[in-house]
Amino acid sequence: MIRVGLILCCIFIAGVFEASSADDMLTAHNLIKRSEVKPPSSSEFIGLMGRSEELTRRLIQHPGSMSETSKRGPPKKVSRRPYILKK
């Protein structure tokens, strides 16, 4: 009879512990869900045409873009052992 009481007591304590940890998880989830995050600005929602226009504007403003570097030709060959001086 005492063993049955101990088993039921352990089950009750485990249930209470499980319920309290579930409440903590819900609280953490609600805090994450309600965290103060700034809503995205309207400039972040650019249509596909707007993105292409913005991209071409960036390429024109920055002359070191990939289109410019591809016109320069292949890269120069560099010695694999720069510490050896050529005579």
UniProtKB/Swiss-Prot annotation:
Any one of the GO BP annotations: neuropeptide signaling pathway
Keyword Protein biosynthesis: no
Propeptide: 23-37, 52-87
Annotated positions of the Methionine amide modification: 49
Localization per record: Secreted
Keywords: Amidation, Neuropeptide, Secreted, Signal
Signal peptide boundaries: 1-22
Compositionally biased spans, kind Basic residues: 73-87
GO cellular component terms given for this protein: extracellular region
Annotated region described as Disordered, given as residue ranges: 61-87
InterPro entries, alphabetized: Tachy_Neuro_lke_CS
UniProt note on tissues of expression: Expressed in the posterior salivary gland and more specifically in the mucus-secreting gland cells.
First-listed, main subcellular location of the protein, grouped into a coarse class: secreted
Entry's family note: Belongs to the tachykinin family.
Role: Tachykinins are active peptides which excite neurons, evoke behavioral responses, are potent vasodilators and secretagogues, and contract (directly or indirectly) many smooth muscles.
Protein name: Tachykinin-1
Species whose genome carries this gene: Octopus vulgaris
UniProt lineage: Eukaryota, Metazoa, Spiralia, Lophotrochozoa, Mollusca
